[in-house]
């Protein structure tokens, strides 16, 4: 093979390898986008009763009950969440609201009825515990897929479900994790398992989809859990009485309704 032909062959091989790597990265990002939409953007809005069971490292359990309302402006775009706590008595009537802004800092507020106070939650508090659970505030309302780089690292199965295995790394400094492995169902695009690692590559937390049902023709995760491997303990969240496309009024997601919950949905 002459030198010119050899050089051309080398260039073509390199181009194919680069193109393949770019396509794989693009595919991984697309998978994570679809997963985010399937998990956090089902229908245009949603209402559900929620039971949260918090188990500490000694096995002691606490249960909290609340109602969650969600409204989307567009798929992958701004969202609004409203959460009203029923039980236990020490947090009864506490409300929590999020205005998610994909390209900016989310806005979060909490209403504390015991002191009649609406308190903004700082953007850097998004990784703190959501009402004492093993889920963070951001776990509840979602971390946007565009904030991380994604790599398709393989295929596997969870139970009988074939999944993609995606490695995600934050684009900017982030307290939540250094690396995350997501096991995304190839049929529903829901994340069936997520493993969170710190900067020393130590496993810190594990998220699991415990139960999935079809509700109003939408594949829905009705039971999910988060285990803190590093510190111990686990929180399980169960959704019931789920309704989609209810026609929620946008005015619900304002400070007025933090103090005065919408009785149509909070009975």
Protein language model regions, located:
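Ribonuclease/tRNase effector modules and their secretory precursors
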Residues: 26-27, 51-53, 62-68, 75-77, ...
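Bacterial N-terminal signal peptides that target proteins for export
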Residues: 1-12
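N-terminal mature ectodomain segment of secretory-pathway/periplasmic proteins
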Residues: 28-114
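Short, low-complexity, Pro/Ser/Thr/Gly-rich segments in the mature regions of secreted, periplasmic
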Residues: 254-267
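Gly/Pro-enriched, hydrophobic low-complexity segments
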Residues: 33, 86, 97-99, 107-111, ...
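Sec/Tat signal peptide C-region and signal peptidase I cleavage site
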Residues: 21-25
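Hydrophobic alpha-helical targeting segments used for export or membrane insertion
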Residues: 13-18
């Amino acid at each position: 093979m002459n030198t010119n032909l050899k050089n051309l062959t080398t260039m073509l091989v390199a181009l194919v390898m680069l193109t393949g790597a770019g396509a794989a990265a693009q595919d991984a990002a697309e998978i994570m986008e679809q997963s985010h939409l399937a998990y956090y953007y089902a229908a245009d809005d949603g209402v559900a009763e929620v039971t949260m069971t918090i188990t500490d490292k000694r096995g002691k359990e606490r249960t909290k009950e609340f109602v969650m309302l969600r409204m989307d402006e567009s798929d992958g775009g701004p969202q609004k969440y409203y959460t009203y706590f029923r039980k236990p008595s020490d947090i009864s009537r506490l409300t929590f609201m999020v205005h998610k802004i994909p390209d900016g800092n989310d806005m979060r507020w909490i209403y504390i009825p015991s002191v009649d106070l609406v308190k903004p939650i700082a953007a850097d508090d998004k990784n703190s515990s959501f009402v004492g659970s093993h889920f963070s505030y951001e776990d509840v309302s979602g971390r946007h897929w565009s904030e991380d780089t994604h790599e398709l690292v393989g295929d596997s199965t969870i139970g009988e479900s074939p999944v993609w295995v995606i490695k995600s790394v934050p684009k900017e400094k982030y307290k939540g994790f250094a690396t995350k492995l997501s096991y995304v169902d190839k049929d529903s695009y829901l994340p069936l398992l997520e493993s969170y690692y710190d900067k020393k590559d130590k496993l810190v937390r594990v998220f699991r989809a415990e139960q999935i049902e079809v509700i109003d023709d939408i594949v829905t995760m009705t039971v999910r859990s988060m285990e803190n491997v590093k510190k111990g303990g686990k929180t399980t969240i169960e959704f019931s009485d789920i309704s989609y496309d209810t026609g929620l009024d946008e005015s619900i997601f304002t400070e007025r309704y933090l103090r005065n919950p919408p009785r149509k949905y909070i009975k």
